[in-house]
């Protein structure tokens, strides 16, 4: 039976905090046990209640702290609590620093409930994978990575010429290919589309940093692009 994960929201705008709380509580496996509006309030709360928490939803723009100071303070003192950023901060430096701070996810406001629930589902799968185990296999870690890729693909607004159903087929084909990867021709045979169509989807996945390509040279020296999931 899946446990009920307890959540703290750190958000200075009480209206946004209320919306986030409702969205989280609408998920069957999560429950918000408190909200904090300042860094000082959050650290005081965590000093007493961190052991009861599983996850923090954290904004970057908190009035009494600068930048990601609160993230680092939480990470230094309360390492057993996972952190998911939910913020309007889009700066690359901010995102990179947050990732170095060990966050489990980074969501940009405004966040739709469906997207948040997808990320929470992925979090549940990760927690259940680790559970009380002392060791995991490489295959299990690969499956976890594939879940994360599917979540990201499912939530991204798609440009013209990219169909979600076809995109999912392409991602599934790359998953099955694993470390061997696929050429556009091989992908076309697997999903029943033209080579140019499959190449377009492969290049889209590269553009969104969910896939990569390597150039190989065949027996006659012709370059061949082979695609892999990141």
UniProtKB/Swiss-Prot annotation:
4-aspartylphosphate PTM sites in chain numbering: 59
InterPro entries noted in UniProt: 2C-system_Tx_regulators, CheY-like_superfamily, DpiA-like_HTH, Sig_transdc_resp-reg_cit/mal, Sig_transdc_resp-reg_receiver
A Gene Ontology molecular function term of the record: DNA binding
Classification via SMART domains: REC (SM00448)
Highest taxon of the lineage: Bacteria
Post-translational modification as stated in the protein's UniProt record: Phosphorylated by CitS.
Cellular component aspect of the GO annotation: cytoplasm
Pfam family name, one: HTH_64
Keyword Lipid metabolism belongs to the record: no
Alphabetized UniProt keyword annotations: Activator, Cytoplasm, DNA-binding, Phosphoprotein, Transcription, Transcription regulation, Two-component regulatory system
DNA-binding region: 184-203
Location(s) in or outside the cell: Cytoplasm
All copies of domain Response regulatory, residue ranges: 6-124
Functional description taken from the UniProt entry: Member of the two-component regulatory system CitT/CitS.
PANTHER family linked to this entry: TRANSCRIPTIONAL REGULATORY PROTEIN CITT, TRANSCRIPTIONAL REGULATORY PROTEIN DPIA
Protein name: Transcriptional regulatory protein CitT
Organism: Halalkalibacterium halodurans (strain ATCC BAA-125 / DSM 18197 / FERM 7344 / JCM 9153 / C-125) (Bacillus halodurans)
Gene that specifies this protein: citT
């Amino acid at each position: 039976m899946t446990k009920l994960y307890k959540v703290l929201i750190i958000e200075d705008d009480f209206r946004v905090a209320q919306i986030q709380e409702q969205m989280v509580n609408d998920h069957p496996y999560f429950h918000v046990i408190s909200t904090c509006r300042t860094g000082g309030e959050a650290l005081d709360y965590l000093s007493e209640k961190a052991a009861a928490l599983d996850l923090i939803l954290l904004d970057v723009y908190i009035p009494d702290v600068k930048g990601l100071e609160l993230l680092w303070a939480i990470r230094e003192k309360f390492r057993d609590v996972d952190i998911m950023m939910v913020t309007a901060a889009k700066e690359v430096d901010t995102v990179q620093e947050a990732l170095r701070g060990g966050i489990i996810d980074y969501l940009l406001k405004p966040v739709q409930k469906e997207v948040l629930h997808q990320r929470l589902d992925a979090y549940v799968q990760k927690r259940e994978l680790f559970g009380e185990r002392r060791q995991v296999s490489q295959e299990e870690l690969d499956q976890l990575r594939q879940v994360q890729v599917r979540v990201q693909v499912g939530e991204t607004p798609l440009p013209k010429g990219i169909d979600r159903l076809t995109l999912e087929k392409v991602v599934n084909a790359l998953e099955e290919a694993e470390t061997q990867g696929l050429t556009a021709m091989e992908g076309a045979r697997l999903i029943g589309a033209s080579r140019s169509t499959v190449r377009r989807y492969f290049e889209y996945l590269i553009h969104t940093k969910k896939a990569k390509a390597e150039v190989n040279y065949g027996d006659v020296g012709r370059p061949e692009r082979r695609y892999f999931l990141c």
